[in-house]
Amino acid sequence: MMLSRAKPAVGNEVQQIDKKKKKGKKVPRLDELLAQRDFTGAITLLEFKRQVGESEEDTELWIGYCSFHLGDYKRSLEVFKALSQQEGCNPDVWVNLACTSFFLGMYKEADEAANKAPKSRLQNRLLFHLAHKFNDEKRLMVFHQNLQDVIEDQLSLASIHYMRSHYQEAIDIYKRILLENRDFLALNVYVALCYYKLDYYDVSQEVLAVYLQQVPDSTIALNLKACNHFRLYNGKAAEAELKGLMDSTSSPIEFAKELIKHNLVVFRAGEGALQVLPPLVDVIPEARLNLVIYYLRQDDVQEAFNLIKDLEPSTPQEYILKGVVNASLGQELGSRDHLKIAQQFFQLVGGSASECDTIPGRQCMASCFFLLRQFDDVLIYLNSIKSYFYNDDTFNFNYAQAKAAVGNYKEAEEVFLLIQNEKIKNDYTYLSWLARCYIMNKKPRMAWELYLKMETSGESFSLLQLIANDCYKMGHFYYAAKAFDILERLDPSPEYWEGKRGACVGIFQMILAGREPKETLREVLNLLRSTGNTQVEYIIRILKKWGKENRVPV
């Protein structure tokens, strides 16, 4: 249910809908065509009468009206604007001009025209929506109070609830109207859309099926069905649902075409994003958000930030995405300010009454506490939703880090090893946490193998430091000594020599206690011989003497 655009679209070409062929010789009357909602036929009749000199007083008004209902807002605007400039024009022209301007995203012009129109329920509904567009709460409440308990006004109220993310309130209104008007089939699409927004995708499908049984070629309904399939299954299943629309010989209005192009990019995991999404950024609200997501997936955090920094968030999705972008930029730049902003956005969504019990709301609270390094609280929220994310690599990455941060290394290791995404598995954060889990779980050799697979870099040096220090603390002296030995070769710092010396002595003590094979002594001596420190000869003499006494070849 797209009530309006975000961008004026007067310059767009609008496709004319194919004219239906009418059987029989009888010329239909205008009121019959309007009752059948055959607006193409109505325009054809009106234009024919005008050509043969039989046009009536309100011919142009009806042409503008029919063009509006065909989605040809550009032509409708031209007609109503011309009528408004005539002396003594029909007062209805102003509210019609306002409606057309509204649907073209020309909200200022719509407001000016609406205020010139006579007071009516339609004028009040339009001003109600304009107040929402202008974020004018005071005006919004004034026009809200003028709404009556009639279908049009209640539908208008439901759409405002929808746009303000009050989906349950909108559902309640639609269901109440449906109870009394079973033939209002299109309301099922609106109900289905609300359930979609509430993440009840299976319920949305059930409600949508009622409408599609009667109108199987509905562009909006099929698009929503595809979106449900995307959430329930995958992008291929979603794209298959749109195939009929893409192959159709009928021409949906231009906005529906743009919506389909946009959604195909999402279904195809961002394929073609840079070609399709930029022109739609100010037309389809989600296009900006999806382009930001695309940049984040390409690790272009700065470009994502540039695109979203001036967006004033008004929906949970916008707050969440601004939080994610600020968190990513904060980590990349080491900026406490960006991390603080991210934490506040996450807390705002996760703590709100409407989102606190939703999956995204709980993810937000987990993210908030993650940035605050309160990992026990992180786990409270992640544990409550983990059943929904068993195979989600990003979720498991964060979940495993939180497990490890509270010292639950056994479970953390298990979750880390569930991750399949190669990009995550090559990330230093993943490697360092997994290495720590291996060491804490008495598997130092596996941590060492992680290091051996890395290319020489600043990250491999940092991992070596972690292995050296963690293995030393845990009494895995053999791998601590090997790590300190390489560190000493790369950087002849006294602290690395001291670490290696302590680890080598630790290995010797374990040999004496029978917890390490005697043959390891030879490797310890080789490690010590690679050091130029004066203390090393004394240690080597003691070890060699013990080896000779215990018949250990050195």
Swiss-Prot record:
TPR repeats lie at residues 57-90, 92-125, 151-184, 468-501. This is Intraflagellar transport protein 56. It comes from the Eukaryota. The keyword Protein transport applies. Component of the intraflagellar transport (IFT) complex B required for transport of proteins in the motile cilium. Required for transport of specific ciliary cargo proteins related to motility, while it is neither required for IFT complex B assembly or motion nor for cilium assembly. Plays a key role in maintaining the integrity of the IFT complex B and the proper ciliary localization of the IFT complex B components. Essential for maintaining proper microtubule organization within the ciliary axoneme. It holds the Pfam family TPR_8. The keyword Protein transport applies. SMART domains: TPR. Residues 1-23 are annotated as: Disordered. One of its GO terms (cellular component) is cilium. It is found in: Cell projection, Cilium. Component of the IFT complex B.
